[in-house]
Curated annotation (Swiss-Prot):
CDD domains for this protein: RHOD_YceA (cd01518)
Protein name (record): tRNA uridine(34) hydroxylase
Similarity comment: family membership: Belongs to the TrhO family.
Record EC number: 1.14.-.-
A Pfam family reported for this protein in Swiss-Prot or TrEMBL: UPF0176_N
Keywords: Oxidoreductase, tRNA processing
Catalytic residue list: C177
Gene of this entry: trhO
Length: 274
């Protein structure tokens, strides 16, 4: 049996987000759906996996709430369920930028996957990867700037420093991330800093892979995923990952305990404990 992996998010006011937690958890458990859903007053952010029929029922269930109706989701596939359990978490901030009461309603302009290559190929465009360094190490777009962040909360400090000599130049900025939520929020931050021409990849890297197959080879490497697959290639096929210490391919079981891109085989992990 194959599994569908679905990522989705929506910034929307959910005043009763804490009441939704148990309802979503119960539905997912009943339909053998696993993964992580994050709920906050600002909306919902999730990656879940299960049978296609189960996910179809899940999104029909979400449609019952007008705030979550017709939510756009991006699908990829796996031979196994890349999640071991179902989690529905409550957060004060949907995606943690670390700035209290930050308003991300005024954000950048979407660019479709089909138009993305033309944008980032321009010599007057700064392409910024809003993911963390451990993710970028597996792959990125050609010539993209790596902010060298360990977590998304580090991004504002980097952005303020980077912007200090560029705001007055009124540059064109193109931003991207895995599924779209971090680049959407980061474009709002860049707009807040005074940049006007700010764009972000609609649907993120995963939708870009699905829509374009990386035809122009502007993507280099694999894309890190926050599940047991660790990475997928530009055909959305789980890649083979090597241990960062001994360079052997790690097994699927070893991948299940990988944290933040620190890929170690069992042997090297044991050595590291000594």
């Amino acid at each position: 049996m194959g599994y569908v992996v679905s990522t989705f998010y929506r910034f929307v006011h959910l005043s009763n987000y804490y009441d939704i937690q148990s309802v979503l958890k119960e539905f997912c458990v009943q339909h053998d759906i696993k993964g992580t859903i994050i709920l906050a007053e600002q909306g919902i952010n999730a990656t879940i996996a299960g049978a296609q029929s189960a996910l179809n029922q899940f999104f029909s269930f979400l449609d019952l709430d007008n705030r979550l109706k017709d939510i756009q989701h991006h699908e990829s596939f796996s031979t196994h369920n890349p999640f071991s359990k179902m989690k529905v978490k409550l957060r004060n901030e949907l995606v943690r930028l670390g700035i209290e009461n930050f308003d991300n309603s005024v954000c950048g302009e979407y660019v479709s996957p089909q138009n993305w290559d033309d944008l980032i190929s321009r010599s007057d465009v700064y392409t910024i990867d809003t993911r963390n360094t451990y993710e970028i190490n597996f792959g990125k777009f050609k010539n993209a700037i790596n902010p060298q962040t360990k977590c998304f909360r580090d991004f504002p400090e980097w952005a303020v420093s980077w912007a200090s000599d560029k705001v007055n130049q009124d540059p064109i900025i193109a931003m991207y991330c895995t599924g779209g939520i971090r680049c959407e929020k980061s474009t709002a931050f860049m707009k807040n800093l005074g940049f006007n021409k700010v764009y972000h990849l609609k649907g993120g890297i995963l939708e870009y892979f699905k829509s374009t197959k990386n035809t122009n080879n502007l993507w280099e490497g694999d894309c890190f995923t926050f599940d047991d697959r660790i990475v997928v290639d530009d055909n959305l096929v789980p890649g083979r990952v090597k241990c960062v210490s001994c360079d052997v391919h790690v097994t699927r079981e070893e991948m299940k305990s990988v944290t933040r891109g620190n890929v170690l085989c069992f042997n090297c992990r044991e050595v590291a404990k000594v």
